[in-house]
């Protein structure tokens, strides 16, 4: 599964960026009306883009909205001929995670159509390299952003600098 780089057509490829659990209104507890409404909004955004001809969906696989995005793409794959490509910042990023997150992460990877690893080992720049790879290899960015500084904002700004189309999905 690793390094089996699937051919992607740029004009049919979307990448995703969003916050990790600590910046989410539901703080990682995926229950309640606020979370369910967010999940519906994100699913609708993905499905609308599928109807516009997007086929390839890149996920950075961070804990939080990336995993939600990935699971929604996998669910929609039952209905549409689409592909989930997981783009990891380095090998085995789940080694430091708790059991249930590790299991969820590995389940997504096992069901993904492809897995790309952008750096062999962890470094301070691993996540930035991964995010730039995703933006460089996509036509559009879907962003779930709550006005916090960090990787999500950096990815949005990088996509803007390249003139990429950006679609925002509200966290609230």
Spans of model-derived segments:
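Acidic/glycine-enriched connector segments
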Residues: 7-172
């Amino acid at each position: 599964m690793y390094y089996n780089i699937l051919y992607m057509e740029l004009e049919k490829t979307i990448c995703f960026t969003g916050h990790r659990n600590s910046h989410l209104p539901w703080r990682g507890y995926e229950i309640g009306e606020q979370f369910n409404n967010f999940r519906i909004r994100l699913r609708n955004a993905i499905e609308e883009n599928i109807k516009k001809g997007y086929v390839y969906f890149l996920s950075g696989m961070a804990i939080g909205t990336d995993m939600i995005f990935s699971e929604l793409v996998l669910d929609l794959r039952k209905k549409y001929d689409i592909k989930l490509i997981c783009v990891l910042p380095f090998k085995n990023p789940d080694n430091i995670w708790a059991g249930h997150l590790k299991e969820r992460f590995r389940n997504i990877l096992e069901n993904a159509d492809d897995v790309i690893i952008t750096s062999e080992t962890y470094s301070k720049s691993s996540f930035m390299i991964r995010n730039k790879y995703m933006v460089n290899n996509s036509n559009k960015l879907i962003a779930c952003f709550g006005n916090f500084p960090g990787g999500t904002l950096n990815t949005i700004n990088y996509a803007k600098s390249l003139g990429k189309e950006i679609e925002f999905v509200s966290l609230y």
